[in-house]
């Protein structure tokens, strides 16, 4: 089994992370928006997803991690922590050639371990990305809102006393 870890990203990682995020989200466009040229879905194509400058901003201003598998960067996760107990998964991406191997599940667990005081995690995903719905439910997230374009999920972590 491959070793999967997360490390805080640095400015030196910005180009590689941008390359992987662009590859990942462009694949999602092909899968979920094929033939729908006029559709804009900001969960499938988040603003700035292909911009190295935006990745540098994320690294400087947010909690941005690179996903490492077998000493190679294979993805990333960007989170925002508000206060001590609230976290938001802004973006998670895994190189499409490595998807389906449990990397995303492992990364979510690692992020939860990285922030043990966070009791509420939330995120949004496109209503079109059916694989994401299955993934987030598997990870313990519950739908709190859905519209024609977007699903909002939350995960509440209870502390055993």
Regions flagged by a language model, labelled:
Residues 94, 100-113, 134, 138:
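Conserved acetyl-CoA-binding loop-helix of GNAT-fold acetyltransferases
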Residues 114-127:
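Conserved GNAT acetyl-CoA-binding A-motif
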Residues 81-92, 99, 117, 149-151:
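A conserved beta-turn-beta hairpin within the catalytic core of GNAT-like acetyltransferases
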Residues 1-15, 19, 159-161:
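Conserved N-terminal entry element of GNAT/NAT acetyltransferase domains
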Residues 108, 129-132, 149-154:
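Short glycine/proline-centered loop/turn elements that form peptide/ligand docking sites
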Residues 66, 72-81, 88, 93:
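Conserved beta-strand in the GNAT
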Residues 116, 137-147:
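Conserved acetyl-CoA-binding loop of GNAT-fold acetyltransferases
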Residues 25-54:
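Conserved GNAT-fold acetyl-CoA-binding loop/helix
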